[in-house]
Amino acid sequence: MACRPRSPPRHQSRCDGDASPPSPARWSLGRKRRADGRRWRPEDAEEAEHRGAERRPESFTTPEGPKPRSRCSDWASAVEEDEMRTRVNKEMARYKRKLLINDFGRERKSSSGSSDSKESMSTVPADFETDESVLMRRQKQINYGKNTIAYDRYIKEVPRHLRQPGIHPKTPNKFKKYSRRSWDQQIKLWKVALHFWDPPAEEGCDLQEIHPVDLESAESSSEPQTSSQDDFDVYSGTPTKVRHMDSQVEDEFDLEACLTEPLRDFSAMS
C-alpha cells in the first residue's frame, strides 16, 4: 500500500506565494473578538473596565432597602460598618427590652394587686438615644478606648462583680441622650482613668505617675458640671500621656536670705 505524501503546511505555501500573515494557532481561535472583528488585547480589557467603572452610578437600590444606598470604594470599611450597624441595633433592642422589663416589674409592685386591673406597658424613656449614626459614632469611640493594653489589664485585674462605682472606671452608656460636648468629655475622662492600668514603665523611662479620675459626676449629668471642669484643670495633656500638674511650687525663692548671705570669693575658688 503506497503512502500518500503529506501536503506542505498551508501557511508555508501562503508565505511563499504572497506576504499575507500566517494563520493563528489552534489555541487562539477561541479568543473573544471586539465588535469590529478585531481580537481583544490586554489594553482593551483595561480600557473597558475603566469605562465601566466611570459609567457606574454613585448609588444603587436593593429589594431590602427602602432608599438608595451610596457606593463605597473601600469594601473592607463597608463590611466593618455594616457589622457595627448590626451590632448596635441588636444592643439597642436588648437595652430597650431590659428597660421595659424593669419598668414592668416596678409597675406590678406598685399596683393594687387586683386581677382585673390592667397594667399598661411602659414606653421608652425620653432620654433614650435612637439615632443610628450617633450610636455608631459612640461605639467607635468606645472600641478605640477598649483596644488598649490598659483596658485588657483592667478587665483581668478587676472582674465585673468587684467593680465599685466611683472607684473603677465605667464605660459611658451610649444609649443615653447626651450632648456632643458632654459625651466627648465622658469618653476623655474614661480614657484618662484607664491609664491607671497602663503597664509599668521600664527602667530609665521618664514617665510621671497617672492618677485615677472620678467619673461619677460626668456620667450622671447630661451637661458638663463644675466637678468635671475641676478634673480638667488638674489634668492637662493628651489621653495618651497625661501629667499631674502640681499647683504649688516646691522650692520658693527667699529674697531676704539671699541678701544676708555673705559674698563668696569666686576668684579664690577658681
UniProtKB/Swiss-Prot annotation:
Residues 37-58, 84-94 have a biased composition (Basic and acidic residues). Residues 218-228 have a biased composition (Low complexity). Transmembrane segments: none annotated. GO terms for biological process: cap-dependent translational initiation; mRNA 3'-end processing by stem-loop binding and cleavage; mRNA transport. There is a cross-link at K98 (Glycyl lysine isopeptide (Lys-Gly) (interchain with G-Cter in SUMO2)). Residues 129-198 are annotated as: RNA-binding. This is Histone RNA hairpin-binding protein. It comes from Homo sapiens (Human).
